[in-house]
């Protein structure tokens, strides 16, 4: 596992965007050989999406031959609702870059057959071989996507019941009214994430410090689903300074020395 220790959320966004752009450009995608990118929603990736849009407008990257798969979607929320992840992604990213509409894949939380929707999503991912880079965030309780504590580390795309804490955390997007937050969501599984060639998780804020500690210094544990990254051959944690407050001093010093050349110029 790599840990990229930065200072601010803006630096995390810039580093993550730069890494995505470098991976896409090094891959040299074509129509017949697209780059497959996994994407999250929420507050954490906002600085990354902003930086990606700026880099696209500066001519540094094209998304014309990029296929995207989003991590999750609420169940029962209309697609046009301002807080659906469909709306979020278009508002903050897709509408500002050159990605073709047919290259965008989002789970349908209003599908008549939820199980079939989840199964087809997995099949479509497999049809491209694999996701080359999956970016994500992490919850205060260590959940990735909507894989809440005690999720199977072998799980695939499925419907999940959201914990009260997750709904409270997300209520800031729903006028701070937890009753407006859906109780269920469709989400890729932990196993789906682990199948990706590379996984990059962004960690922001002191409220995520225990989750980061569990991911880096703890044991692999289904109560902290983020710890599954210890099993991945190419995992990256990109974090700001407040999120590192629970890490041991020697752990942080080790990664600072290891990544010194990779965090320059932000």
UniProtKB/Swiss-Prot annotation:
Superkingdom of this protein's organism: Bacteria
The enzyme class is hydrolase
Control of this protein's activity:
Allosterically activated by N-acetylglucosamine 6-phosphate (GlcNAc6P).
A GO BP term here is:
N-acetylneuraminate catabolic process
Q: Which GO terms describe its molecular function?
A: glucosamine-6-phosphate deaminase activity; identical protein binding
Matching NCBIfam families = nagB, PRK00443.1-5
PANTHER family tied to this protein: GLUCOSAMINE-6-PHOSPHATE ISOMERASE
Protein family membership:
Belongs to the glucosamine/galactosamine-6-phosphate isomerase family. NagB subfamily.
Oligomeric state and interaction partners are given as: Homohexamer; trimer of disulfide-linked dimers.
> What is this protein's name?
Glucosamine-6-phosphate deaminase
